[in-house]
């Protein structure tokens, strides 16, 4: 059985690539999905619909276009991985974690020890917490091979 894993969250480091490479090295039967991680094109996702000089409305229409992809991929996934970095506030990641929880999709949080307290409710809903992409790969190895 091929597993579908949704990778959500922080876009400024290569954590996704590390997980994908680690899973490939172990030959895990996993398909990985993610929201658009290119910040500029994500912010401009709705620009073709209407020109907007007001930042709120530009963000609003682009977020709706992005949500078409995000909602469908989250609904289809078997497990989610939600990465919270310590440098930026990842509101989208928190929203995705809430959506995963609401849909009863198991998910793993990935973040440093230094932000445990602000993420306590998110971590409480998660099935596991990891600090490194390698730990995520080990969890995926275990759940997909047993």
Q: Model segments located where?
A:
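Conserved catalytic or regulatory cores that recognize and/or transform ribose-phosphate-containing ligands
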Residues: 1-146
């Amino acid at each position: 059985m091929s597993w579908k894993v949704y990778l959500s969250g922080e876009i400024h480091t290569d954590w996704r690539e590390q997980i994908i490479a680690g899973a490939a090295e172990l030959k895990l039967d996993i398909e990985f999905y993610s929201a658009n991680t290119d910040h500029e094109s994500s912010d401009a996702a709705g620009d073709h619909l209407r020109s907007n000089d007001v930042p709120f409305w530009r963000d609003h229409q682009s977020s709706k276009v992005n949500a078409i992809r995000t909602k469908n991929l989250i609904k289809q996934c078997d497990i989610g991985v939600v990465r919270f970095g310590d440098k930026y506030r990842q509101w989208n990641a928190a929203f995705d974690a809430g959506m995963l929880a609401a849909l009863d999709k198991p998910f793993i949080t990935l973040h440093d020890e230094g932000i445990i307290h602000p993420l306590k409710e998110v971590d409480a809903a998660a099935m596991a917490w990891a600090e490194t992409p390698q730990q995520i790969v080990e969890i995926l190895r275990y759940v997909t091979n047993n």
